[in-house]
């Protein structure tokens, strides 16, 4: 059995055990652990828990508001990275302050801030509203969830510093940020599991998507650590994509599918497709993201190893990458048909346009990402020059519209207020969609031209 399949087998087994524990329940898990967990979430924190309010909806609101701020910061760094990629000396004046940014560092910072600050916080915040609604209960601890949002924000600040300067005073800054982030994530998981234990009925499929999205992050790391994959390039690549397919894709699917029912007023078009999304998200390898595992290695304080697949691992990885088309197509079909069901086009509803854009864009960007990943896995590396632009497209044309479209659709219900201006929301949508699609398409054409020049033996103009 190759390393890829070994790691995935451990992950699949742990996911199955988790499902059995949650679905059937154990008396020691529901009685003793619940009491201890509630104590840990609130009273164990002492006076610190009184710094935040515990009103209903305060936690989702805090997470979503901070995600908006991080999205703004991520957009700035992403733009500056693209700018320096075409004009390396554009920010040369900053060297007088001792700061010498490069396109690579700014792009990396933009990706981290957008992904973990903007998108992840929007998904977690929306999930804190969606899960209790689906389960007919309240969030276990609004106070703890609100307080943890600031801890998560602090981890993003550390990430942002670490992406610019990875080591300060001999300390690995990225690893410190990961440690803080893991603590915050474990608190979120504990809070949501306690919410799940207080349910009044069965668990709907979107709730399973959100729960598995949260727990797949630590389960992926545990599986890779147990099999020793974290020290290999292929293992680092796998962990990166397992988290992408679990935490980000499944969480997005759960939140978006609920939001589409809110936007359209229709029931989900197909429950069968929901099952395909969950099983496919767990049992395949997500294609979106980088073509190596350097980012995962940096987050874990490890040296980035060369990505080498041996023992048939490349065949396994390529097959599972191709099979990930099933959950992606199932998600796009279910969300779009639910959104447009009954021939009711609600373009003015909060988040309708954003969810529609993300659901439409996910298929072509998935195909582009699939070609990139299989090209890298097989060692061909013929189109690797487009990876950065395709990755940025996946963030800004798919993940950002889906996560923030859902947040916009749910935010009025969370706060009990209306959006300040629908006109501004519409303007923001057109600016984002036109800017992302047009700007990145031009950048993609530039990448293709650059690869053609390099293949022809012409000096790289950049």
List each language-model region with its residue ranges.
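Hydrophobic cores of alpha-helical transmembrane segments in multi-pass integral membrane proteins
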Residues: 3-44, 60-87, 92, 100-135, ...
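Extended, leucine-rich alpha-helical cores of fungal transcription factors
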Residues: 200-208
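Conformational-control "hinges and anchors"
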Residues: 347
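Inter-helical loop and helix-membrane interface segments of multi-pass membrane transporters/permeases
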Residues: 165-173, 230-235
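Loop-rich catalytic cores of soluble enzymes, especially ATP-dependent carboxylate-amine ligases
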Residues: 234-242, 307-311
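Alpha-helical multipass membrane-protein architecture
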Residues: 265, 299-315
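Cytosolic juxtamembrane amphipathic/interface segments immediately preceding
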Residues: 45-59
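Membrane-interface helix termini and inter-helical loops of multi-pass transporters
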Residues: 230-234, 298-306, 378-381
């Amino acid at each position: 059995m190759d390393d890829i399949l070994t790691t995935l087998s451990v992950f699949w087994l742990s996911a199955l055990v988790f499902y059995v524990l949650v679905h059937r329940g154990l008396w020691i898990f529901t009685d003793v652990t619940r009491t201890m967990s509630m104590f840990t979430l609130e009273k164990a924190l002492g006076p610190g828990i009184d710094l935040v309010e515990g009103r209903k909806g305060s936690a989702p609101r805090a997470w979503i508001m901070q995600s908006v701020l991080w999205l703004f910061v991520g957009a700035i760094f992403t733009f500056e990275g693209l700018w320096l990629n075409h004009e390396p000396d554009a920010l040369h004046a900053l060297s007088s302050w001792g700061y010498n940014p490069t396109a690579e560092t700014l792009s990396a910072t933009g990706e981290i801030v957008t992904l973990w600050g903007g998108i992840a916080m929007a998904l977690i915040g929306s999930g804190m509203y969606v899960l209790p609604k689906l389960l007919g209960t309240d969030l276990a601890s609004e106070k703890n969830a609100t307080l943890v949002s600031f801890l998560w924000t602090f981890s993003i600040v550390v990430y942002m510093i670490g992406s610019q300067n990875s080591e300060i005073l001999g300390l690995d800054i990225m690893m410190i940020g990961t440690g803080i982030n893991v603590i915050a994530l474990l608190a979120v998981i504990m809070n949501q599991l306690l919410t799940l234990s207080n349910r009044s009925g069965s668990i709907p499929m979107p709730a399973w998507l959100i729960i598995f999205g949260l727990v797949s992050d630590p389960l992926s790391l545990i599986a890779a650590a147990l099999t020793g994959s974290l020290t290999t390039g292929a293992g680092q690549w796998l962990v990166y994509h397992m988290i992408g397919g679990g935490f980000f894709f499944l969480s997005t699917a759960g939140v978006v599918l609920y939001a589409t029912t809110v936007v359209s007023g229709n029931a989900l078009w197909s429950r069968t497709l929901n099952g395909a999304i969950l099983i496919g998200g767990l049992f395949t390898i997500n294609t979106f993201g980088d073509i190596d595992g350097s980012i995962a290695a940096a987050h874990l304080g490890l040296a980035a190893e060369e990505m080498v697949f041996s023992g048939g691992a490349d065949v396994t990885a390529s097959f599972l990458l191709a099979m990930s088309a099933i959950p992606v197509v199932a998600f796009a079909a279910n969300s779009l048909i639910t959104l447009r069901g009954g021939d009711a086009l609600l373009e003015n509803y909060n988040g309708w346009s954003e969810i529609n854009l993300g659901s439409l864009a996910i298929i072509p960007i998935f195909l582009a990402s699939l070609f990139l990943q299989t090209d890298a896995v097989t060692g061909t590396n013929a189109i690797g020059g487009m990876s950065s632009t395709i990755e940025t497209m996946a963030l800004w044309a798919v993940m950002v519209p889906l996560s923030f479209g859902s947040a916009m659709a749910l935010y009025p219900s969370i706060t009990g207020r209306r959006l300040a201006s629908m006109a501004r929301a519409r303007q923001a949508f057109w600016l984002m969609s036109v800017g992302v699609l047009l700007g990145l398409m031009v950048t993609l054409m530039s990448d293709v031209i650059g690869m053609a020049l390099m293949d022809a033996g012409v000096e790289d103009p950049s």
